[in-house]
Amino acid sequence: MALLSQAGGSYTVVPSGVCSKAGTKAVVSGGVRNLDVLRMKEAFGSSYSRSLSTKSMLLHSVKRSKRGHQLIVAASPPTEEAVVATEPLTREDLIAYLASGCKTKDKYRIGTEHEKFGFEVNTLRPMKYDQIAELLNGIAERFEWEKVMEGDKIIGLKQGKQSISLEPGGQFELSGAPLETLHQTCAEVNSHLYQVKAVAEEMGIGFLGIGFQPKWRREDIPIMPKGRYDIMRNYMPKVGTLGLDMMLRTCTVQVNLDFSSEADMIRKFRAGLALQPIATALFANSPFTEGKPNGFLSMRSHIWTDTDKDRTGMLPFVFDDSFGFEQYVDYALDVPMYFAYRKNKYIDCTGMTFRQFLAGKLPCLPGELPSYNDWENHLTTIFPEVRLKRYLEMRGADGGPWRRLCALPAFWVGLLYDDDSLQAILDLTADWTPAEREMLRNKVPVTGLKTPFRDGLLKHVAEDVLKLAKDGLERRGYKEAGFLNAVDEVVRTGVTPAEKLLEMYNGEWGQSVDPVFEELLY
């Protein structure tokens, strides 16, 4: 879901020309003005972590006290004053902010995030908040994580550059540290699952790796005590029919990857969007709703098609010749806001735009101007299939068992971090039309790899793509290609994980979804 995703680390203006294409060099190299924090990048490094980000590190702006391993912050995000510009922000500053994500290739990292459903083993019911609080406290005390509080409620944990956070329906999320290899990424996932299981088992709690809540109704799901979610819950039904399901009943796995320049960002963005439906098919794992088959292989993916058209989708403008950081900023400026954060409170700004905010004409905060923190927060409320912040997020996959949590980043690292594979993907998809990309996005949640495409099936494209991913990993030289074994059989047979679940449901499970809680238990 990535509702909380916040860019980590601080940011800096890149030297002229490092992250630019013709026509934007001046903007990129000179966009951010009068920001003392820009020198802090070396001090803090870079992180993909979602919970506290830069803001929690800038001590002048966060009132906090430490007692043992408890980190008290006013709320999440901790403060609206974290990054203070001495002059009003301009559109050029916002462009430069995105451009500041450019890194040299030796600094490329892999940031993996995944969500899972906690449930009572005896009843299969979703975890309640008091159980989640007990679990978070237990993990903090046993494994030395810092607690993140909103008021007097524990809402997450932090340890180094990793964080654990709660999605609106109590989905438990690990936002991993930015790591160099997939071996490190998979070890991090396994360590996290071990820690969670060690505490949860004693409480009679299990965790389920699936893309959509298979058994319980929306009204059975507990709501987490986080201020921003109240605003979103009130707004969602106004803009789509499935937004509340997205918030409360979905789980995803995603990977965050770096780019070296604006041109490199564009190439990776286009490749990621074109192939996102293939990732959706390979990891499709949400065929049940309220105890029965729902007609989809990825209900989670389908839900995004009727959540909020203003902030979701396949972003056809990314394929325009004119696309770059500037065009993404213009898109984001006109995506309606959810909230601003002032004086430890969330202010409802739904339906208003950041463009109005930039002009000091936000009806919910008349005369006020935005900070970088406001911009960071706004970028996290945009939910396309690939999202740009100071890195790119691949957002098309369902949550699943641990092997697939390692396979998803492996798939994208092999394709996007290897120049030959990336070029091959761009060549392969160069003549795909916007209508074809949209068709795949809409049909794959129903028909998976059996979706007809041109003269064959999507399965045949996936075979070529998986080979490119493996080749890309081999060329990296870290012996990482084995992480793709979890999706080998899916591509070879054309049978998605969801179709295997449906086969068991109609066979040995006797048309009950209850066995899925054991089948996909972490």
Curated annotation (Swiss-Prot):
One of its GO terms (biological process) is glucosinolate biosynthetic process. GO terms for molecular function: ATP binding; glutamate-cysteine ligase activity. Changing C186S: 20-fold decreased activity. Abrogates the response to changes in redox environment. Changing C349S: 2-fold decreased activity. It is found in: Plastid, Chloroplast. The keyword Plastid applies. Changing C406S: 20-fold decreased activity. Abrogates the response to changes in redox environment. This is Glutamate--cysteine ligase, chloroplastic. It comes from Arabidopsis thaliana (Mouse-ear cress).
